[in-house]
Amino acid sequence: MKQLATPFQEYSQKYENIRLERDGGVLLVTVHTEGKSLVWTSTAHDELAYCFHDIACDRENKVVILTGTGPSFCNEIDFTSFNLGTPHDWDEIIFEGQRLLNNLLSIEVPVIAAVNGPVTNHPEIPVMSDIVLAAESATFQDGPHFPSGIVPGDGAHVVWPHVLGSNRGRYFLLTGQELDARTALDYGAVNEVLSEQELLPRAWELARGIAEKPLLARRYARKVLTRQLRRVMEADLSLGLAHEALAAIDLGMESEQ
């Protein structure tokens, strides 16, 4: 059969904010900005969407580990990198936003997150993983949305009530609550809390154990375990993004008055 998917040798060199390394079928995905902690930009937003697609299409990937660089996973955002002046700009954001989380869910092998530090921008991304490990320094907060007057409609509204339960999830989003690693563990958003030194070795230990399982067991386990989240995401993501866009446009108009 002709192989049409982009080979690892190509897509592993494709992204400026994502470092990709593979050993024994375990793919390590490290997000960064110039080798330091990831700054959330329009480029990082779009790159992750397309990188997740490349990963999903590569059947040589047996398990995926997702982690960050430096003291934080993603604790800073560059708002100036986003062009949000016209309906066409927002249409592009909605287009890419749908692909970001849907492409992550389209990966048909188990995904392990190793959250190396605070994450205030898109904290839903790591907690969508099948196994979530957190460093003791990790914190989780949805910073750029409701605390800033924006609807948390880009998938946060789907993921956090799913992970924390309806009441805790809504409270988390509406109050800007920051969860430390131990609280996230108690709430079920995190599976293990480890020291910074133990974090990646533990992720690799789990990944290698999963990689030894039969191919179809690995792939189909991922599919059945994410089915409910995929179904809700498909139903609610686009509407949430549209509402987020309207609220953001309204906020921008108010600030200009």
Swiss-Prot record:
Record bears the keyword Hydrolase: yes
EC number: 3.7.1.18
Domain of life per record: Bacteria
Active-site residues (renumbered): 124
Transmembrane segments: none
Record's keyword annotation contains Magnesium: no
Effect of residue 122 to A: Great decrease of catalytic efficiency, and the binding affinity is five times that of the wild-type
Regulation: Inhibited by copper and mercury ions. Also inhibited by thiol active reagents, such as N-ethylmaleimide and hydroxymercuribenzoate. EDTA has a slight activating effect.
MF term (GO), any: hydrolase activity, acting on acid carbon-carbon bonds, in ketonic substances
Gene3D superfamilies to which the protein is assigned, alphabetical: 2-enoyl-CoA Hydratase, Chain A, domain 1
Keyword set, alphabetical order: Hydrolase
Residues involved in substrate binding: 40, 145, 154, 244
Catalytic activity from the UniProt record: bornane-2,6-dione + H2O = [(1S)-4-hydroxy-2,2,3-trimethylcyclopent-3-enyl]acetate + H(+)
Pfam families with a match to the protein in the record: ECH_1 (PF00378)
pH profile: Optimum pH is 7.
Function recorded in the entry: Catalyzes the carbon-carbon bond cleavage of the bicyclic beta-diketone 6-oxocamphor via a retro-Claisen reaction to yield the optically active (2R,4S)-beta-campholinic acid. It is also able to cleave 2,2-disubstituted cyclohexa-1,3-diones such as 2-methyl-2-propylcyclohexa-1,3-dione and 2-methyl-2-butylcyclohexa-1,3-dione which result in racemic keto acid products. Transformations of the bicyclic diketone substrates bicyclo[2.2.1]heptane 2,6-dione and bicyclo[2.2.2]octane-2,6-dione yield (S)-keto acid products.
Quaternary data: Hexamer. Dimer of trimers.
Family: Belongs to the enoyl-CoA hydratase/isomerase family.
Name listed for the protein in its UniProt record: 6-oxocamphor hydrolase
Gene: camK
